[in-house]
């Protein structure tokens, strides 16, 4: 075998960059993979491409191959010793087929989990903003062992199985040959340290449930479902990683007077028919205090009045919303005789036709029994 055959298999020149070699390998690996290409000879082609890439993707093996050919590269490879192995090949293989090992370092610092807390607000608190104390329990660093997980007076030691790497190599025989992948160490669970004498409080986890409280400022104008993020107020991280975050979710209680949509507030005003017909001046409640509203003569049900800047503020700042007052003219019931006469005179004066139901025989009998 000459010193260019591996390059020829990948279709690149001897001066090709690492990116060009990787790109060519990805293309050919996908083209000839046995799970995709069922044509005769595809599997052999795939193995040849794999062999070429295993050598040319490693700088040391590539240098040995360029100087001594395949024999030099195989000598430099040294079987399955070391963590390098098929690392480069597996990362590429994983990107296509989801197999191989993980490139993530399980011993790396990792942020703790986020938490969520629901806070109830009155209608007015949501409008004007407030401050609340949030009390909850979270996983925090163990106070007995200061988060080390080891019994006081002892310390974690380097894991004897993974030698502190947090991962171990596992060789698997496949139809394509021996494959190597990295898995999380089953002794230290990726921490790289063994705890010979676990803390009796946290049982070696380094975490314990603790009561915690924090004050949160609720901005003016919030609505149900909106969240406020408090960085670092979640649960403790792993391997020295930072705490997670706390998300405070707002729940606003309904008002017995108002309804709200965004920055707009709505209020229903009941008027008797005299107020609606003759006009009046009434006090209207708003979240900012009562205001006087002049009701003009002849106001009908459904009429809307706008009170500027009497609504809710916007979370983004700027002008305050408005309040809309919707009129409902209430028809009186249970009129006495004097009121009925007055209404009949009103109808006659306006030439209004009114045809009330005349009482029949059974109506008079019913009235007689009702009067007993």
From Swiss-Prot:
Supply the source organism for this entry.
Streptococcus pneumoniae (strain ATCC BAA-255 / R6)
The protein's matches in CDD domains, at most eight in alphabetical order, are given as: DnaJ, DnaJ_C, DnaJ_zf
Q: Name one GO biological process term.
A: protein refolding
Give the UniProt subcellular location, in the record's own words.
Cytoplasm
Its gene name is dnaJ
Q: Can you provide one Gene Ontology molecular function annotated for this UniProt record?
A: zinc ion binding
CXXCXGXG motif repeat locations: 142-149, 159-166, 185-192, 199-206
Gene Ontology CC terms, in alphabetical order: cytoplasm
Q: How does it assemble?
A: Homodimer.
Among SMART domains, the record links this protein to: DnaJ
Segments forming CR-type zinc fingers: 129-211
User: What task does this protein carry out?
Assistant: Participates actively in the response to hyperosmotic and heat shock by preventing the aggregation of stress-denatured proteins and by disaggregating proteins, also in an autonomous, DnaK-independent fashion. Unfolded proteins bind initially to DnaJ; upon interaction with the DnaJ-bound protein, DnaK hydrolyzes its bound ATP, resulting in the formation of a stable complex. GrpE releases ADP from DnaK; ATP binding to DnaK triggers the release of the substrate protein, thus completing the reaction cycle.
Record text about domains? The J domain is necessary and sufficient to stimulate DnaK ATPase activity. Zinc center 1 plays an important role in the autonomous, DnaK-independent chaperone activity of DnaJ. Zinc center 2 is essential for interaction with DnaK and for DnaJ activity.
Tell me the Pfam families matching this sequence. DnaJ, DnaJ_C, DnaJ_CXXCXGXG
The prosthetic group or cofactor this protein requires is:
Zn(2+)
- Please report which protein family the annotation says this sequence is part of: Belongs to the DnaJ family.
> What region holds the J domain?
5-69
Transmembrane portions of the chain: none
Q: How and how many cofactors are bound, per the record note?
A: Binds 2 Zn(2+) ions per monomer.
Designated name of the protein: Chaperone protein DnaJ
Specify whether ATP-binding is a keyword of the entry: no
Classification via HAMAP family: DnaJ
Q: Which UniProt keywords apply?
A: Chaperone, Cytoplasm, DNA replication, Metal-binding, Repeat, Stress response, Zinc, Zinc-finger
């Amino acid at each position: 075998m000459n010193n260019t055959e591996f390059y020829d298999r990948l279709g690149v020149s001897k001066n090709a960059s690492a990116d060009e070699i990787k790109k060519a390998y990805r293309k050919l690996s996908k083209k000839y993979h046995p799970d995709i290409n069922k044509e005769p000879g595809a599997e052999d082609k795939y193995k040849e491409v794999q062999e070429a890439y295993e050598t040319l993707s490693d700088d040391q093996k590539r240098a040995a191959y360029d100087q001594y050919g395949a024999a030099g590269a195989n000598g430099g490879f040294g079987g399955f010793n070391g963590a390098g192995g098929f690392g480069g090949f597996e990362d590429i293989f994983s990107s296509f087929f989801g197999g191989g090992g993980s490139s993530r370092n399980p011993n790396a610092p990792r942020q703790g989990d986020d938490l969520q807390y629901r806070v109830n607000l009155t209608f007015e608190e949501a409008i004007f903003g407030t401050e609340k104390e949030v009390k909850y329990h979270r996983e925090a660093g163990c106070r007995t062992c200061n988060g080390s997980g080891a019994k006081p007076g002892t310390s974690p030691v380097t894991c004897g199985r993974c030698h502190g790497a947090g991962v171990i190599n596992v060789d698997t025989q496949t139809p394509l040959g021996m494959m190597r992948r990295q898995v999380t160490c089953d002794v230290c669970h990726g921490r790289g340290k063994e705890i010979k004498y676990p803390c009796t409080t946290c049982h070696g986890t380094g975490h314990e449930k603790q009561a915690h409280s924090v004050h949160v400022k609720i901005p003016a104008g919030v609505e149900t479902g909106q969240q406020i993020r408090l960085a670092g107020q979640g649960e403790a991280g792993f391997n020295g990683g930072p705490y997670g975050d706390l998300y405070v979710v707002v729940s606003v209680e309904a008002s017995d007077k108002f309804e709200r949509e965004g920055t707009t507030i709505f209020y229903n005003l009941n008027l008797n028919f005299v107020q609606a017909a003759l006009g009046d001046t009434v006090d209207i409640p708003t979240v900012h205090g009562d205001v006087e509203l002049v009701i003009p003569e002849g106001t009908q049900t459904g009429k809307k009045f706008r009170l500027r800047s009497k609504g809710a503020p916007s979370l983004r700042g700027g002008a305050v919303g408005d309040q809309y007052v919707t009129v409902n003219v209430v028809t009186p019931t249970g009129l006495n005789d004097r009121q009925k006469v007055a209404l009949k005179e009103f109808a006659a004066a306006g030439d209004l036709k009114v045809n009330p139901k005349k009482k029949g025989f059974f109506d008079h009998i019913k009235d007689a029994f009702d009067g007993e």
